[in-house]
Amino acid sequence: MIAKLAPAAALLFALHVTPAGAAAQGTRVPAADPAAVVREGNARFTVLTDRLVRMEWSAKGAFEDSATLVVVNRRMAVPKFETARQDGWRVVTTDALTLRYKEGSGRFTADNLEVHLATGNVDATWRPGAASTGNLGGTIRTLDGVKGPVDMGPGLLSRDGWTLVDDSESPNLVGTGPAWVKARSADDDQDWYLLAYGHDYRAALGDWAKVSGPMPLPPHFAFGVWWSRYWAYTDQEEMDLVRDFERYGVPLDVLVVDMDWHNTFELRWGTSDRDAAGHTKGWTGYTWDKAYFPDPESFMSWVHHQGLRVTLNLHPASGIQPWEEQYPKVARDMGVDPATKEYVPFTIWDRHFAQVYFDDVIHPLERQGVDFWWLDWQQENTTGIPGLNPTIW
């Protein structure tokens, strides 16, 4: 089994409560040290650690040295390894594994590629297509609609002692300054990472963190007590709720304000009205409902004075509709005449839209007092860039 971890692997320990600008900084050099690279025809092998090897095959012999949405760093201290040709096979050996690839044999298959690992109390041989029967499971994008057991998909750790991460279709991250996402080449290339760690799971996580980038530490308040209920509270009812926590000596750290903070057009389950994006009208919204929150700045200031953080529910899929307070500015900044009432789609993969979205919509609300956002369901799981999930991005 090939672990299609995609961006979730790189974000293994990240939480939605971490502001986007607070990502931890660390070594991010996508091109590996040439001394770690072994080229064999249209195949390339990069020894990243003694337990982690990158395996690439390209029909054109054109290999990827840019960062991807999963892997941002390949420049690490070159581990001790040896390489040689033996009886028509390219052999790469580290202290933890021995890789063998049949010279000139084309795409990676079970007939031309194998990795023997003898580390962490595991002695096994991996080949492409091998089933990972001991995988411990991965992550799930959303729990909406889940009413029982759910398949979590493959994760980073396995009792088999190895994990294969397929990064062949992950979008690239390119550009100077803040990198941006770019569609991967349409060529049918293979770009795999094999972690051979035996039962040393800490080593597996450590090695993967080196290539996927440092994970931001969740803030202290994220581990506290949260209040969340899908209910149309007024600001006074929210304040009474907070006072009740104090009155009964129950700790509270985060106040979650569900979607009725914005205009919902009296949305109820079964509502059939659709917005211009084709979604149920009222799910997406950015304009305060003054019937419930007549003075949002004062309300959030009061919450902060109680020592709490406040988060607002957000369903972004419908973009910026013409009834939003922010619409005229967003439309102009996106080159749309506001008089047309043409909605602005949620094309978050477009760098210009993303800048406008944060400058004109998100950041002004944060200046009012929003600490972070609850990114809720509704958005699709595809974008205009293959392999890019809008929830993750």
Predicted regions and their residues:
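Short, Gly/Pro- and small/polar-rich lid/capping loops
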Residues: 25-32
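Mature N-terminal segment immediately following signal peptide/propeptide cleavage
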Residues: 33-57
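Short, solvent-exposed loop/turn and secondary-structure capping segments
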Residues: 66-68, 102-104, 111-113, 166-168, ...
